């Protein structure tokens, strides 16, 4: 394979690299990126990787991910690396790790949990109880959830 760039470099924004093959669209969904926001997003799927065999890459022009967003990506892409780009240069590089607390992003899978009651304005909250593999507990009903199950 030639050493050409499949997608041009971005001036400012975020590059999410080392996403397991086939999971880039799920990463975009987790980040709430649908394509209607006006952001330039480049998506490369199933490219060769020495580390993973095949991988996906997402480039988001004009948006830097928050630390919470970086770590929530670990739900579907535990091998991902996040690069923050400014003026075409990498200024920060992160490995994703499961967050200690997740608030308001996912629903509890327990149908009787108070967070699922339509008349209860309770924000779903989950606490990390195990890092490998990530396991969370609902702050309200005590049900355990693997991070990938919360998606």
Curated annotation (Swiss-Prot):
Binds 1 zinc ion per subunit. Its cofactor is Zn(2+). Zn(2+) binds at residues 108, 113, 138, 141. Transmembrane segments: none annotated. Keywords: Metal-binding, Pyrimidine biosynthesis, Zinc. InterPro entries: Asp_carbamoyltransf_reg_N, Asp_carbamoylTrfase_reg, Asp_carbamoyltrfase_reg_C, Asp_carbatrfase_reg_C_sf, Asp_carbatrfase_reg_N_sf. GO terms for biological process: 'de novo' pyrimidine nucleobase biosynthetic process; pyrimidine nucleotide biosynthetic process. GO terms for cellular component: aspartate carbamoyltransferase complex. GO terms for molecular function: metal ion binding. NCBIfam families: ATCase_reg (TIGR00240). Contains catalytic and regulatory chains. Belongs to the PyrI family. Involved in allosteric regulation of aspartate carbamoyltransferase. This is Aspartate carbamoyltransferase regulatory chain. It comes from Pyrobaculum aerophilum (strain ATCC 51768 / DSM 7523 / JCM 9630 / CIP 104966 / NBRC 100827 / IM2). The gene is pyrI.
